[in-house]
From Swiss-Prot:
It comes from Salmonella schwarzengrund (strain CVM19633). It catalyses: cytidine + H2O + H(+) = uridine + NH4(+); 2'-deoxycytidine + H2O + H(+) = 2'-deoxyuridine + NH4(+). This is Cytidine deaminase. One of its GO terms (cellular component) is cytosol. CDD domains: cytidine_deaminase. Its EC number is 3.5.4.5. The keyword Glycosyltransferase does not apply. Homodimer. InterPro entries: APOBEC/CMP_deaminase_Zn-bd, CMP_dCMP_dom, Cyd/dCyd_deaminase_Zn-bd, Cyt/Deoxycyt_deaminase, Cyt_deam_dimer, Cytidine_deaminase-like, Cytidine_deaminase_bacteria. Keywords: Hydrolase, Metal-binding, Zinc. One of its GO terms (biological process) is cytidine deamination. It holds the Pfam family dCMP_cyt_deam_2. SUPFAM superfamilies: Cytidine deaminase-like. Residues 48-168, 186-294 form the CMP/dCMP-type deaminase domain.
Amino acid sequence: MHPRFQTAFAQLADNLQSALAPILADHHFPAMLTAEQVSTLKNTAGLDEDALAFALLPLAAACARTDLSHFNVGAIARGVSGNWYFGANMEFLGTTMQQTVHAEQSAISHAWLRGEKGLAAVTVNYTPCGHCRQFMNELNSGLDLRIHLPGRAPHTLRDYLPDAFGPKDLEIKTLLMDEQDHGFTLTGDTLTQAAITAANKSHMPYSHSPSGVALECKDGRIFTGSYAENAAFNPTLPPLQGALNLLSLNGYDYADIQRAILAEKGDAALIQWDATAATLKALGCHNIDRVLLG
């Protein structure tokens, strides 16, 4: 078990501990539960779906990287597939506050990058900030997405974001978590191809500036992130943050990164290179390359 989970795990009910122990035994537990695992945990612990999600929130919050605020937020995105995806907030010292990943963004991008096609609900231990409410409004679940908070009745995103502005106001039909493939040809080595594949998945209907990042760890593991734009622009999630989020949720540290590649168009309206390189260098990675999409 990764050390970050030990305190939260010890506070769980005994029957839930017994069911979770073999799942968490892997140091690189992927911070997600399959639909089958969720069903097993519900039956073993005698909890319904909502109660189980609340019980597991401390494990999600344990994934937080909060060197600045020391305020850990955890979220669980429940996919329409039945799979559950952990998320937690991330802060990066030596960069800027704009590089921060919020817990809801973490869980949602986690689900998206693992191929989830839509979300039924998000469970979070603190009320979503306005930034996250706007981020969630880009999803194909729209304002019907259910939000669950401890000690409160469940509500929809519509309740948390009245008179919402979103992609439909801009006549955008393809939404975040809809399947997308921009068709850029895969070239280069495995890591380069992973970055291009991530760029092909980008949600960028406003700038038309696709980008993807691939991070290679010292043990050969590769994590990718795709660019996810938002109708309100500022809640947009850069591709590097998506990749760093997956890396961290899987129990790796920034020091494990040995190489990084950004794939983007050289003549795009928005360029990720400077911000990507600066953030990676602040985290200790200097082996950074860029491949231009054709």
